[in-house]
């Protein structure tokens, strides 16, 4: 039996394909349309799935549009436009789709699943107690109370795109902590008064984007800690768009924590169609054939200090985890500026280290497991001195812990030849464009950046 899971219509469209209950493919719409955060699943992605696995017998959709329209009416918003898809769709619940994706890809049998996002149909935060696959809703917030909507409104107020550039706001929050306490109190009062943030926020003359970012992150972290402090469980699964706030995720150390590779709405394309445990695997997208070029990568890094890699199946989600990556030598002092120039990014934006799991505690302080760049750790003094290009302004690093080949072999050989235990790893794209997907995208990236891609 062939079944599809889908997300589309709002933002972060995605398609997942199951054959006889085995997940065989998942990809974000933007990789195929080349439109950042594309809400529509493009025809070329649908045709690719049809040609490779056949026509689906059932198609699941990640939310309930009737409930969503009820909430939009309550909020004074216009009804949703009618959604059109090639096949009939079966509607699911937004937060349940998140929760199922998180739980069924996690290592836990019993746990608490925490979902925080901008908004589903009505829910903006839910907690689920799960025992051997049996989900019980134990806590919830409904619209208009929403940490995700608050953070998106602050993103817009700072001059960036809501529902797309929240990660820039998060990075910018480390630039300064010297904000005006009265500005903080004014914004906090909006949160405390349960303001509806879906129409944006008026900050009455506050225009410094770094001050706005710092206040937004501080308020988010304060409210996030209130939520997690009440959770009584050893095992925690965290999903929803807010699970991408890697800075705040550093507070999850009291739990055995699992955050999947695509915790936002894209991952719900898997969750809405999933009803059993599967092994977590981020490499589910389009495949560029060929052996992973470990020797060539190291040679290029030693000669030019930077190289792109596009081999194997593309990652599902917003993180490049070695198969669609731009690698650089983190021991070069000005490497951060060089990579930011190639990618056209803001100078304050951080870069991640890819490092063997067994080396993490040598170079970074305590934190939760991070195979998918899903949290930050404080870098040790030694790391900050030796590898400054992977340390953010606040002294943290967003880590990718590596355990499996071929990336394990790459790091082992790199360490053996250079003594450096890590690589700077960032996504293979330039600012404003989706991550490279196929061979055609590779050529375009090489032409635009003059960086070799293997």
Predicted regions and their residues:
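Phosphate/pyrophosphate-binding loops at sites that engage ATP/ADP/AMP, CoA/4′-phosphopantetheine
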Residues: 44-58, 227-234
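Phosphate/ATP-binding catalytic cores across multiple sugar-kinase/actin-like superfamilies
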Residues: 214-236, 414
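Active-site pocket-shaping loop/turn-to-helix segments
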Residues: 30-40, 214, 218
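Short glycine-rich phosphate-binding loop at a beta-alpha junction
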Residues: 54-66, 233-241, 308
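Flexible beta->alpha loop and helix N-cap segments adjacent to enzyme active/binding sites
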Residues: 7-36, 51, 66-68, 72-192, ...
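Extreme N-terminal starter segment of soluble prokaryotic enzymes
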Residues: 1-4
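Secondary-structure capping and boundary motifs in well-ordered enzyme cores
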Residues: 208-212, 216, 220, 240, ...
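Active-site cores of enzymes that catalyze phosphoryl transfer or operate on phosphate-rich substrates
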Residues: 171, 177-218
């Amino acid at each position: 039996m062939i079944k599809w899971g889908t997300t589309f219509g709002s933002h972060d469209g995605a398609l997942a394909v199951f054959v006889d209950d085995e997940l065989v493919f998942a990809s974000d719409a933007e990789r195929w349309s080349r439109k950042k955060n594309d809400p529509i699943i493009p025809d070329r992605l649908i045709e690719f799935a049809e040609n490779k696995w056949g026509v689906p017998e059932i198609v699941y959709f990640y939310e309930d549009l009737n409930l969503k329209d009820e909430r939009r009416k309550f909020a004074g918003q216009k009804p949703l436009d009618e959604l059109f898809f090639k096949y009939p769709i079966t509607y699911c619940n937004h937060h349940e789709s998140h929760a199922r994706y998180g739980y069924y890809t996690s290592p836990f049998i019993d746990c608490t699943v925490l979902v925080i996002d901008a908004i589903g149909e009505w829910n903006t935060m839910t907690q689920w107690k799960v025992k051997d696959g049996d989900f019980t809703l134990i806590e919830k917030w409904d619209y208009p109370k929403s940490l995700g909507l608050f953070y998106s409104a602050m993103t817009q107020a700072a001059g960036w795109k809501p529902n797309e550039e929240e990660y820039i706001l998060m990075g910018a929050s480390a630039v300064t902590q010297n904000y005006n306490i009265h500005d903080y109190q004014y914004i906090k009062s909006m949160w405390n008064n349960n303001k509806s943030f879906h129409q944006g926020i008026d900050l009455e003359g506050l225009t410094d984007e770094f001050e706005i970012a710092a206040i937004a992150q501080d308020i988010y972290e304060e409210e996030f800690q209130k939520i997690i402090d009440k959770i009584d469980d050893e095992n925690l699964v965290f999903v929803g768009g807010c699970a991408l706030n890697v800075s705040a995720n550093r507070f999850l150390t009291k739990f055995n924590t699992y955050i999947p590779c695509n915790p936002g709405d894209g991952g719900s394309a898997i969750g809405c169609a999933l009803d059993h445990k599967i092994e977590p695997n981020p490499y589910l997208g389009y495949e560029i054939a060929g052996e992973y070029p470990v020797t060539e990568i190291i040679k290029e890094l030693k000669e030019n200090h930077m190289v792109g890699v596009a081999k194997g199946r593309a990652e599902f989600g917003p993180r490049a985890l070695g198969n669609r990556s731009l690698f650089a030598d983190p021991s070069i002092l000005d490497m951060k500026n060089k990579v930011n120039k190639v990618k056209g990014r803001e100078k304050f934006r951080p870069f991640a280290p890819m490092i063997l799991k067994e080396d993490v505690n040598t170079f970074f302080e305590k934190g939760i497991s991070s195979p998918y760049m899903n949290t930050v750790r404080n870098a040790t003094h030694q790391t900050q001195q030796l590898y400054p290009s992977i340390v953010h302004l606040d002294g943290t690093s967003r880590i990718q812990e590596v355990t499996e080949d071929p990336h394990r072999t790459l790091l082992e050989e790199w360490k053996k030849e250079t003594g450096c235990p890590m690589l700077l790893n960032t996504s293979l794209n330039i600012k404003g464009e989706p991550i490279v997907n196929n061979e055609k995208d590779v050529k375009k990236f090489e032409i635009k950046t003059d960086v070799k891609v293997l």
